[in-house]
C-alpha cells in the first residue's frame, strides 16, 4: 500500500499531467526510475521531449517547491534523462529536449509551470 506522501505525490503528478495535456503536450511516460533518480513525467511538445519534475510544498518552512530543486537534484534529473534517452538510442547531445518544472503550492489549483527550468 502506498504511503500518504506517495499518494499525494501521485495525485500532484496526475494534476501536472492533466495541466500539461491541456496546454497541448502529449504524455509519453511517468515515474521512470533509475539508480540515479526518477523522472516524474516525460511529455512531447511538438518535436521536443520534455522531462518534467513535479514538486509540491504545503508550507514554506523548508523553502518553496522551486527552491527544493537544488544543484544535486538537478544533476540527478539530468542523469536520469540521459539514461532514459540512451534506452531510446539518443543522448542529451543529440536529442531535442528540455527540462520543465511544475511547482505546486498547497493545492492542485496553485500551480506554476516553468518551461526550460534547466537552461
From Swiss-Prot:
Taxonomic placement:
Bacteria, Pseudomonadati, Pseudomonadota, Gammaproteobacteria, Pasteurellales
Name the protein family.
Answer: Belongs to the UPF0102 family.
Name this protein carries in UniProt: UPF0102 protein HI_1656
Give the Gene Ontology MF terms in alphabetical order: nucleic acid binding
Q: Extract the Pfam families matched here.
A: UPF0102
User: Which HAMAP family did the record assign?
Assistant: UPF0102
Q: Which PANTHER family match?
A: UPF0102 PROTEIN YRAN
The organism's superkingdom is given as: Bacteria
Amino acid at each position: 500500500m502506498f504511503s500518504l506522501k506517495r499518494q499525494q505525490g501521485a495525485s500532484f503528478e496526475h494534476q501536472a499531467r492533466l495541466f500539461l495535456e491541456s496546454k497541448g503536450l502529449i504524455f509519453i511516460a511517468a515515474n521512470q526510475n533509475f539508480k540515479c533518480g526518477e523522472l516524474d513525467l516525460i511529455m512531447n511538445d511538438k518535436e521536443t521531449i520534455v522531462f518534467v519534475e513535479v514538486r509540491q510544498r504545503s508550507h514554506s518552512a523548508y523553502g518553496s517547491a522551486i527552491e527544493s530543486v537544488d544543484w544535486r537534484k538537478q544533476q540527478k534529473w539530468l542523469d536520469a534523462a540521459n539514461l532514459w534517452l540512451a534506452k531510446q538510442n539518443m543522448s542529451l547531445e543529440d536529442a531535442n529536449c528540455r527540462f520543465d518544472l511544475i511547482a505546486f503550492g498547497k493545492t492542485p489549483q496553485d500551480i506554476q509551470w516553468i518551461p526550460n527550468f534547466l537552461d
